Amino acid sequence: MAQYSLEKCAEFAANPHLRAPLSAFTANPRMRDPALYRPSPELAEAVNVALHLGIPLLLTGEPGCGKTELAWHLAWYFHLGEPLVFNAKSGSSATDLFYQYDALGHFQYSQNHAEALSPDELERRFICYQALGVAIRSDGRRVVLIDEVDKAPRDFPNDLLDALDKLRFDVPELGKSYHTSDANRPVIVLTSNS
């Protein structure tokens, strides 16, 4: 079995707050058992290099060859909970990785209610955090799967690299900024079919 090194996993073994429950893996019948996934030695080495350098891992290959399953396997292996998944689409932008703002819903609400919402209420009602936003706001390390980046617009990869490099984002609607520490840097797996 391949052995990975996330700083030899010592931080995770020593800190129970960084270990997420594994029930999500058994509750999702669509995914194969991540404990049974067996990466090649070359793939295990690529994972170790990406983890050591703190950079995203880009996996390319034909549909069904196991790219997505690697993210599930890594989450299982490091006890990081269910991977946070972002499925790239033809209209995706880098901002979509962090959050979505329901501007129309907020507008409709403001037309029907005279009182202004508090930032917390605005966030609760009209902001939906996405995979990378959830990971950055998380108290522990997570696996983020950015699936099928080849389906996104041509400028998406450049915007994505910038977003992944900074691991911070602003929510101007709330006047808030979020960032993560190196200790909580998410394990990021990108997949592409081409």
What are these regions (language model features)?
Residues 1-194:
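AAA+ P-loop NTPase catalytic core and its hallmark functional loops
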